[in-house]
Every structure is written in structure tokens, then in C-alpha cells.
A protein has these predicted regions:
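Short helix/loop capping segments that flank catalytic or ligand/cofactor-binding pockets
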Residues: 5-10, 30-33, 50, 111-113, ...
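Phosphate/pyrophosphate-binding active-site segments
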Residues: 12-109
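Thiamine diphosphate
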Residues: 116-192
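Short glycine-rich anion-binding loops that position phosphate/pyrophosphate groups of nucleotides
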Residues: 1-5, 26, 106-108, 158, ...
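Acidic-glycine-rich active-site phosphate/pyrophosphate-binding loop
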Residues: 104-122
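Generic structural signal for well-ordered alpha-helical scaffold segments
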Residues: 89-92, 113, 141-144
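Short, conserved loop/helix-junction motifs that constitute active-site signature segments
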Residues: 9-18, 170-174
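Short His-Asn-centered micro-motif
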Residues: 1, 23, 103-104, 127, ...
Length: 192
């Protein structure tokens, strides 16, 4: 699909010299690193049905073991403390079945990316906005209205303050909505 939002994955892909396969429904080529690639214009689920997974290769065992080690290490470090890292790490515990997750500030998006393993296929939305903090409550309400599914929204304190008027939009949401406001002093964006 399109470009990843993860800074670490984008850095890895920028330096990667191997073969790229891109499965993208759109005809538009998104290739910021100008790598040679094989493109498949198809819906991802159609392509996956036509191309069953390859058997696990021996070289994959080491990264899988490292991944398990990292998951255990993160659990030990984050543990039961109540802070941004623990909320990001344990976020899957509050996700409703057949719901949607909305992540609404850049620091928390990065923490979820680094510290948690979300259920496979669980829909996740985010919106950076023009300034990175505007319109996030409105976006979460719009997702709830459009999808007609339960929504869990994680939004930073400054982002919430900038969009308080959009709370009125939630009167049009028919499914349960949980809004977590992360009190993190603006995610330290003003400390630079």
C-alpha cells in the first residue's frame, strides 16, 4: 500500500537494497526512495488470496526470536505503571470487538507503533491535520459516523483543547465511543 507513517520503517526502507513488491489498489506510484519495485495493482485481500504465504525460511527464526525477546523486555519495562508507554502497550485490552482505533497525536502514534502488537486486521485511523493537532475530535466523530462501529480514540491534551467544539459532533455518533485524553503536556512538542 501507500507510504508507512512509521519513521523507523521508512528509514529501514530508505536503506534497504533488496527487492520490493508493492500491492496497491491505486494506479499512483508512491515511491519516495526511488527503489526499483514490482507493482501489483490489486486490492490487498484479493492479491493475498491468489498468493498464499511462503513457507517459513530458516533465516526468519532469528528475527522471530528477537521479536519475542523484545516483547518480553517491553512488558517488563512498562509493567503495570500508568503512563503513556503503558497505555500504548496495553491498548489492545480496551479495544471493542468489531471496533475502530483512532490515534490522534504524533507522540502516541509513535508509542503504539513501538510498544504494542495490535490485533491483526484491526482498523486504525489517524489524522495529522494542518498543524498536527487540529481537528482530531472531529475526525474521530466522522469515523464513528461513517463506519457506524464503536470507536476508541486516543487524543493528546493539546489536540483535545484545540478541537473542543467538535465534541458537539458526537451527538450524531450512534455507536459507543471512548475518548482517552492523554495528559502529557502537549507531548513535549513545546519543549524544543
Amino acid at each position: 500500500g501507500s507510504r508507512f507513517i512509521s519513521k523507523r520503517i521508512n528509514q529501514f526502507l530508505a536503506e534497504f537494497q533488496g527487492e520490493f513488491w508493492v500491492v496497491e489498489q491505486s494506479q499512483n506510484a508512491v515511491d519516495p526512495n526511488h527503489h526499483t519495485q514490482t507493482r501489483f495493482n490489486a486490492k490487498a485481500h484479493h492479491w493475498l488470496r491468489a498468493h498464499p504465504p511462503l513457507r517459513q525460511k530458516p533465516w526468519l527464526l532469528e528475527p522471530l526470536a528477537l521479536s519475542k525477546f523484545c516483547a518480553t523486555f517491553i512488558e517488563q519495562q512498562v509493567g503495570g505503571n500508568l503512563n503513556e508507554a503503558s497505555l500504548a502497550h496495553h491498548i489492545e485490552r480496551v479495544l471493542p470487538y468489531n471496533g475502530i482505533l483512532f490515534l490522534g497525536n504524533s507522540l502516541f502514534v509513535r508509542l503504539v507503533d513501538a510498544l504494542t502488537k495490535l490485533p491483526e486486521g484491526y482498523p486504525i485511523y489517524t489524522n495529522r491535520g494542518a498543524s498536527g493537532i487540529d481537528g482530531l475530535l472531529a475526525t474521530a466523530a466522522g469515523i464513528g459516523i461513517g463506519a457506524d462501529q464503536p470507536v476508541v480514540a486516543m487524543i493528546g491534551d493539546t489536540s483535545t483543547l484545540y478541537d473542543l467544539n467538535s465534541l458537539a459532533l458526537f451527538k450524531n455518533v450512534t455507536q459507543p465511543t471512548i475518548i482517552f485524553v492523554i495528559n502529557n503536556n502537549g507531548g513535549a512538542i513545546f519543549d524544543m
